[in-house]
Amino acid sequence: MLYKRNPQLNKNGELIHLLSTEGLSKDILTHILDTAANFVSVNDREVKKVPLLRGKSVFNLFFENSTRTRTTFEIAAKRLSADVFNLDIARSSASKGESLLDTIANLSAMAADIFVVRHSESGAPYLIAQHVAPHVHVVNAGDGRHAHPTQGLLDMYTIRHYKKDFANLRVAIVGDVLHSRVARSDIHALTTLGAAEVRVVGPRTLVPPDLAQMGVRVFHTLEEGIRDCDVIIMLRLQNERMSGALLPSSQEYFKSFGLTAEKLRLAKPDAIVMHPGPINRGVEIDSEVVDGPQAVILSQVSFGIAVRMAVMSIVAGNEA
């Protein structure tokens, strides 16, 4: 019954694919975060390796460009002692018209164990997960506007590291929520982990009208949206996904929704500032904030390796 409801889980309720934070229980999310905590120290060792995925093959399939996410997945897999293969999509058979599932079938024939997939089409990792063998696992590295679960998880790890508990937290997610798969993954994870209040802040043109159904409060002014918040997650303006005149200009956006040191004082004195990257200084956030003591953006990047190690080690230990 559980497997039919959630394709990420096997019949025992164990994680076999990571496709979205939506539908994952608090216990599963906490298990991933706890496992990641055990891997953080690996990054500080002289020999930065553990043998958990020795003999396993991890294929990074990035149909969208990425530097940070692909690199951290590669580092994570290598630190688990896996063999890692980065498919050059621009030169692959996919660029010659081969279908997504045919590409997966051919790579599966090469004894792939884990596919890490980033794709511009929402649902592509789900499609792949439905067609792989029981011992093969799929990790979603971002699909369209839909989800970016490992970013959501590393955001949760970062919040827990600095704030210890979600129960009394007021969290604001600010910016281009309409096009953000990170925002959706964060919202699902925050509500499941019991954050006291999740706010979404942005111009009306960049905030989906149905967000209130996800249990969040919507604000259309930055000052009100971040007031008394414990955590502020800034989002990049995704101009490459925009069509039409959703914004007057980047300069006008910064005036209304750019986070400056002055505006940050409206949040709690010990508030932390996060950003999934890449950062556009002077558009969504001022350099003084990025380089200031309340920004934990580089910690997010560092913790991302441990979180992705946790995800791959957990799914690899379970079968459909």
From Swiss-Prot:
GO terms for molecular function: amino acid binding; aspartate carbamoyltransferase activity. Its EC number is 2.1.3.2. InterPro entries: Asp/Orn_carbamoyltranf_P-bd, Asp/Orn_carbamoylTrfase, Asp/Orn_carbamoylTrfase_sf, Asp_carbamoyltransf, Asp_carbamoyltransf_Asp/Orn-bd. It holds the Pfam family OTCace. Carbamoyl phosphate binds at R68, T69, R118, H148, Q151, G277, P278. Gene3D superfamilies: Aspartate/ornithine carbamoyltransferase. GO terms for biological process: 'de novo' pyrimidine nucleobase biosynthetic process; 'de novo' UMP biosynthetic process; amino acid metabolic process. Keywords: Pyrimidine biosynthesis, Transferase. This is Aspartate carbamoyltransferase catalytic subunit. It comes from Delftia acidovorans (strain DSM 14801 / SPH-1).
